[in-house]
Amino acid sequence: MSWSPSLPTQTCGAWEMKERLGTGGFGNVIRWHNQETGEQIAIKQCRQELSPRNRERWCLEIQIMRRLNHPNVVAARDVPEGMQSLAPNDLPLLAMEYCQGGDLRKYLNQFENCCGLREGAILTLLSDIASALRYLHENRIIHRDLKPENIVLQQGEQRLIHKIIDLGYAKELDQGSLCTSFVGTLQYLAPELLEQQKYTVTVDYWSFGTLAFECITGFRPFLPNWQPVQWHSKVRQKSEMDIVVSEDLNGAVKFSSSLPHPNNLNSVLAQRLEKWLQLMLMWHPRQRGTDPVYGPNGCFKALDDILNLKLLHVLNMVTGTLHTYPVTEDESLQSLKARIRQDTGILEEDQELLQEAGLALIPDKPAAQCLSDGKLNEGRTLDMDLVFLFDNSRVTYESQVSPQPQPESVSCILQEPKRNLPFFQLRKVWGQVWHSIQALKEDCSRLQQGQRAAMMNLLRNNSCLSKMKNSMASMSQQLKAKLDFFKTSIQIDLEKYREQTEFGITSDKLLLAWREMEQAVELCGRENEVKHLVERMMALQTDIVDLQRSPMGRKQGGTLDDLEEQARELYRRLREKPRDQRTDGDSQEMVRLLLQAIQGFEKKVRVIYTQLSKTVVCKQKALELLPKVEEVVSLMSEDEKMVVRLQEKRQKELWNLLKIACSKVRGPVSGSPDSMNASRLSHPCQLMSQPCTAPDSLPEAAEKSEDLVAEAHTLCTQLENALQDTMKEQDQSLRSLDWSWLQSEEEEQQSLERAS
């Protein structure tokens, strides 16, 4: 639909006339704006010179529009009151919803769509137009004039919505379902309409297939620059499976059943849509649209199967090859890995599948765990669902990536850059060169995404390693504090034991146990292992920081962006040349840009893979350190338990010793303070074995008894004082040690209790 400048201001109540939106088969379409409500509508009015037959068609279009109700067919609106009086004739006006996105032709003519729409945009277009055509056919209506100018775009809440307009040539099916009259646009017409043969709904299949092909490739499938008579005689020679009839740069006509390159489809969609186009572009109408599975008119169901595919894109970082896999909702990740092994030769156990953020796919979840709804992002590239494949059996990566093969016409001008070409060929091949440079930039960007995914995964592993290092260091300090306390306690015990052995308690068994404890704790601590691991982790940390500081560790633009912009500008200037200046020309400047882009791509890929190899080496070191740190942490945990057990054992032995000493104090005693000692207390039988001498007299015996009682009281007091001094000394010794580690453990325990 062509756009024109604003028309002279004209009003009808609150409605104000704006610009002409386009010119249809019967008249003009003008936008009107309601100044009070902000509502906009499109008013279609007929030209005065319509023939009776076309006046009849016009009234039929209004009747059809008013009874249709489908989201992909433009809706009729009520003509505002009083506006009919402004019509240039007595024919009724047609009011329709206004779609601010313009028509599909305007969209296709944008520079970036010179080699076809983006994959997501193609899928949403096919879905919308198929839904609209199916609705029309179910209502026994053939459109007969489906083309980009008759499809308008409306921005919905989540994506663009495509709507069919201009049913001026639509035909309701009669009882025989055959029609013989037509006046329409020739380039999208089915052959039987050109031949003025009887036709059915399959004429819309041909138009839809032609439209779909143009949206995929950027040009119409069958000799788009030929006149109708020559076109018909040549194209009818194609086989039923041929979907392309084109001229090469030498003027030779070629037939092909394959979807041409370049386009923006992945390999799976390209293959499936190629077969679907073969159904839609069959020359003979009775066979057209017949699907091998769904039968006659089964093309819509076949298209549904394609549109409902869930596709996972896997970039093999070893070779740079992009693989696409249809996956089901319940397909396991292991099943996907088996398919990947068939395509890449990488064993399942060596495959690592990372998302862009560096997260690995979860083994217990289905293969489709990372897929999103691509239909909601019709303007974006397919990288949003990209998964990066790494081979864990490799310790280094070498660049095995080469630029994609060039289209035939681009290869031709690479060999002959000075060759003059007609303007229409020059325009097409320059667009393909620009697309090739774009493809190099996107391929490079995907590889860089893969390298960054590996880097993000390394940082995740390093973060885990850092947490374990901190935990290991903290545990090492706590263990050291416990060991120091235990060793100090043992040393004090042994020292005090030696001080009192001559006149005090002697126990070889107790002494041996303490010696064994002292030797046992000498093997605890793991200080050397911890120190060695910390040194290795610090060295790894330095390597990772160096990687992050590297220019390739961050997203960059650079040469390819500049070359792509220069190619775009050359192509833009060529397309915008006035018609009288569209002469033959060569492609030297474009070829120079393409060759520079190829060189820049190869150089950048080498840098990416150098960075990737360093990343993989660091990751390997991190993965080697993780189990070693876990092992040391586990050993320190066992050491800590051992120290606690030994400490408990020592404490029990000390208290048992005190218990024995106290029990002896309460037994029979004799002698004087000078002769009484712990050795005697430990052998009470010695007290009983001393000979008794009879007192000389009763008063003397009574006096001696009083002396013994006094002496016993004195000894008890001395023993109590000695025990108190010993306990006080031990308490001071305990207080002098660092007990902060126990406080931290107690706080952790309290926090856990509050959390539970």
UniProtKB/Swiss-Prot annotation:
Linked residues for Glycyl lysine isopeptide (Lys-Gly) (interchain with G-Cter in ubiquitin): K163
This protein's GO CC annotations: cytoplasm; IkappaB kinase complex; membrane raft; nucleus
Region (NEMO-binding): 737-742
Main location: cytoplasm
Binding site for ATP: L21, G22, T23, G24, G25, F26, G27, N28, V29, K44
The organism's place on the tree of life at top rank: Eukaryota
Modified residues (Hydroxyproline): P191
Cellular localization per UniProt: Cytoplasm; Nucleus; Membrane raft
Top enzyme class: transferase
Catalyzed reactions per annotation: L-seryl-[I-kappa-B protein] + ATP = O-phospho-L-seryl-[I-kappa-B protein] + ADP + H(+); L-seryl-[protein] + ATP = O-phospho-L-seryl-[protein] + ADP + H(+); L-threonyl-[protein] + ATP = O-phospho-L-threonyl-[protein] + ADP + H(+)
Domain Protein kinase residue range list: 15-300
Enzyme Commission designation: 2.7.11.10, 2.7.11.1
PROSITE patterns per the UniProt record, alphabetical: PROTEIN_KINASE_DOM, PROTEIN_KINASE_ST
Keywords: ATP-binding, Cytoplasm, Hydroxylation, Isopeptide bond, Kinase, Membrane, Nucleotide-binding, Nucleus, Phosphoprotein, S-nitrosylation, Serine/threonine-protein kinase, Transferase, Ubl conjugation
Subunit structure: Component of the I-kappa-B-kinase (IKK) core complex consisting of CHUK, IKBKB and IKBKG; probably four alpha/CHUK-beta/IKBKB dimers are associated with four gamma/IKBKG subunits. The IKK core complex seems to associate with regulatory or adapter proteins to form a IKK-signalosome holo-complex. The IKK complex associates with TERF2IP/RAP1, leading to promote IKK-mediated phosphorylation of RELA/p65. Part of a complex composed of NCOA2, NCOA3, CHUK/IKKA, IKBKB, IKBKG and CREBBP. Part of a 70-90 kDa complex at least consisting of CHUK/IKKA, IKBKB, NFKBIA, RELA, ELP1 and MAP3K14.
Domain notes: The kinase domain is located in the N-terminal region. The leucine zipper is important to allow homo- and hetero-dimerization. At the C-terminal region is located the region responsible for the interaction with NEMO/IKBKG.
Function per UniProt: Serine kinase that plays an essential role in the NF-kappa-B signaling pathway which is activated by multiple stimuli such as inflammatory cytokines, bacterial or viral products, DNA damages or other cellular stresses. Acts as a part of the canonical IKK complex in the conventional pathway of NF-kappa-B activation. Phosphorylates inhibitors of NF-kappa-B on 2 critical serine residues. These modifications allow polyubiquitination of the inhibitors and subsequent degradation by the proteasome.
Protein family membership: Belongs to the protein kinase superfamily. Ser/Thr protein kinase family. I-kappa-B kinase subfamily.
PANTHER family attached to this UniProt entry: IKB KINASE, INHIBITOR OF NUCLEAR FACTOR KAPPA-B KINASE SUBUNIT BETA
Name under which the protein is recorded: Inhibitor of nuclear factor kappa-B kinase subunit beta
Lineage of producing organism: Eukaryota, Metazoa, Chordata, Craniata, Vertebrata
